[in-house]
Amino acid sequence: MSDPFQPTRGVTTLDRPASGTAYLNQSSVDWQETGTTGFETKPLYQSASGEMTMLMKIAPGAVSEAHAHDTVEEIYVLEGSFFDDENSYEAGDLIIRAPGAVHTAGSKSGALVLLKFSPA
């Protein structure tokens, strides 16, 4: 099962610093189409080991097909409301999904979420 939310073009993100602090002004990163109507991502961080952090904007009424990720998925709802097969979530809610968990995703009124993917 493929991941429908991968960016459709190259990812320019922040690198993890060897020491000190790294900084990325997210306004310098463009929103990218994902190949799933109504879902756009803004990649922020990606490591060689497979860790990735991104913002995802979900348009009102958008719903994904069933899919799974081969990583742990953490979702923090920043704005609006978000739903999957199990629950509905509001701003401030945190969702953690196991690798391989098949699910859909969507929003009735629109949402902005922070996604973090980590190797299992």
Go through each PLM region and give its residues.
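A short, N-terminal "cap"/entry segment at the start of jelly-roll beta-barrel domains
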Residues: 1-50
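Ligand-binding loop in jelly-roll beta-barrel domains
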Residues: 39, 99-120
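Acidic/His-leaning functional-site neighborhoods
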Residues: 43-46, 50-57, 61-68
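Glycine- and acidic-residue-biased ligand/ion/polar-headgroup-sensing regions
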Residues: 59-60, 69-84
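Residue-level marker of beta-strand positions
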Residues: 63, 93-94, 112
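Short acidic-glycine-tyrosine-enriched beta hairpin
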Residues: 84-104
